C-alpha cells in the first residue's frame, strides 16, 4: 500500500501547541526544512490570532535557518535540546525566552528512551528514499532518527528531499543499542566496521504522509584560515609528530576526531600535508570539506561520522563519485558516532575548540563571560573525556586582543582539568599530562598565553592563596569583570579585588 503524499503545509497543520518534535539530522545536514518552515507560518498565524503556539524540539545537534531560525523568530520554541548554532535561537536563549537543555550529544537518544525528556509526539525525518514497507533511507546525517521514529506517539512525517541522491543508499549504518540492563558491547572495533542496517525501519502505519521537496542543505562554508589558525594547526601537527617519535602514538597513527571550523581545517591540512604522518582513519561526529579532500587524496583511509556537514558543492561531488566513497564512508546515529565505549576502545586523538582555558587546564567551551550561551557543549565532552589523547585549541586572544583566552579561572566549566591532556594556541603547546596544578599553570602561561597577558597572569598567581590549586577567590574573575566594565581585560588591576 502506497504511503500518502501530503504538502508541507498539511503536515504542519497536524502539529499542535505543546507538541514535542523529534527531528532527523545533525547540524544542518539531514534536518527537515519544508515542514518546519511551514510550522513557523502556523505559529505566526496563531500568535496573530492571540492564541499560544509553541513546540518542543529534540534534535541530534544543530539545525539550519529553516528550523531553529524561523521557529525562533516566530517565538515558536518552548524547549529545545541539545546543541545549536543558530543566531536567532541564541538571542532568545540568552534573553531567557527559550528553555535550552545542553546535553552531551552521545546521551541524547538514550535520554529520550529513558523518558527523561518527556514524550515525542511527532518525528520528522528527511530521506532520500522510502519504501512502502517503511524503510526510510536518511540523507546526510544519522542523528537521533531511529529513536524518535520508533517512539513518536502521534506519527512520523517524511520529507522526501530530491536534492539528495538515492545513490547514497548504503552509506548509513543504523544501529540502536538496547537499554540497561540488557545492553551489550557495541561491536565496532575499527572506524569502518558496520553493525546495523542501511535504513531506519518505521512501522508504515505510523507514517502519516510523505512531503516531497527539493531543498539544499543549509551548511555554511567556514571562513578561510588565517596566520593564527594556520599556526595552531602546525603546532598540533608538530606535537603529534613528537609523540609519534617518542613512541606514545603508534607509528600507524590513531583515529582522529576533530571539531569544525577554520582551525579544524588548518589542523587537518597540516596533518594531511605532512609526509611523516601515515594515511589515517577518522572517527568523528561531523565531517567537513577538508576530510573529503583528504579522502580523495588517499590521506584519509576511512571516515566514520554522524553527518556530512559539507558545502553543497562537496556533497554533490560525494554523490557523483559515490563508488569512491561508499566503502570508505560510514554515517552513524549520534549515540554511536559519539559513544564513549567506542571512543575509548579505538583510542582516538580528540581535538576540539575552547572559548577559554584557565591556569589549571579547565576548559569553557560554551559560555561568554560565564552567562551568555554561545552554542553548546556538542560532542566535545563525549570525545575529550574518553580519548586516548585529549587536545583543546584556541587563539590566545579574541576581540582584537581585548580578551585573553587564558584566564585565572574559567567563567563556566564544561571540561575539567581531569579531562584535558594538552592545550594548544598559536603561541605554543602546554602538555599537561602528569603535571600538578602548579606545573600546569606555569606551562599554560609560558607556552600558551599571549605575551600581552603573561605578566598579568603571573601577577594573579602572586596574590593567589596557597593550596593544591592556588586561587584568590575575590580576584578569580577580575579579568572577566574588567572586560564587562571597561571592554578590555588588559586594564585589569588585581589590587582592586584583593580584600
Label every model-predicted segment.
Residues 1-499:
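Conserved alpha/beta enzyme-core scaffold
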